[in-house]
Amino acid sequence: HWRNVVELIPGRHHTLALCADGTVLAAGQGYGQPYAVSGWRNVTQIAQSSGLAAAVTASGTVYALWADSNEPVLGTESWQDITALAPGDDFLLGLTADGRVVAAGHNEGILSAVKDWRNIIQIAAVSEAVAALTGEGRVLFCGNPRFLRYEGMECWQNIRQLVSYQNGGSVFVG
């Protein structure tokens, strides 16, 4: 029985729940098993995609597991001062307190594209694409063009928030 759940994220293969005491619960098929999250503690934020599950702790460190193997997402163990996460199918982005974006996973194009992004205040990801909002209200994009739907992006100014969702395709809205 799940009790004291403060956040629930349903997914294609799993459901993640963040409890008031900072623990995380998981249920679902998980390619044969749910995520192994029983050891996750002091969690303040959870995120998932069809490829992975992740969480930010109160100290700004990250837990992250691949869906198909329950193995850690390599590279995230050294992340510090993380304030937000954005998972894609085969990558995970973290936003640091000083506005940098860190990345781990298997999508070399995205990992390379975001490494120099600075002054970022929000990140969002879907499948194989990423958007980031800068402190100046500009939006940066990268990823598979099939998943990027942006018309007139060069005219976007003073954007205040990014919203991402998936419903058969991928969309970012500013």
State what each model feature region is.
Residues 21, 59, 98, 135-136:
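Acidic/polar residues in short coil/turn loops that connect beta-strands
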Residues 2, 15, 40, 52-57, ...:
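Aromatic/pi-system hotspot detector in well-structured domains
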Residues 1, 25-39, 63-78, 102-116, ...:
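Short glycine/serine- and acidic-residue-enriched loop/turn motifs that recur at repeat junctions
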Residues 5-6, 43-50, 81-84, 120-122, ...:
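Repeated scaffold domains used in trafficking and secretory/extracellular systems
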Residues 14-17, 26, 52-55, 64, ...:
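Conserved core positions of repeat-based scaffolds
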Residues 10, 61, 81, 87-90, ...:
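Residue-level hotspots at or immediately adjacent to binding/recognition sites across diverse folds
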Residues 6-7, 25, 38, 44, ...:
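N-terminal non-cleavable signal-anchor helices
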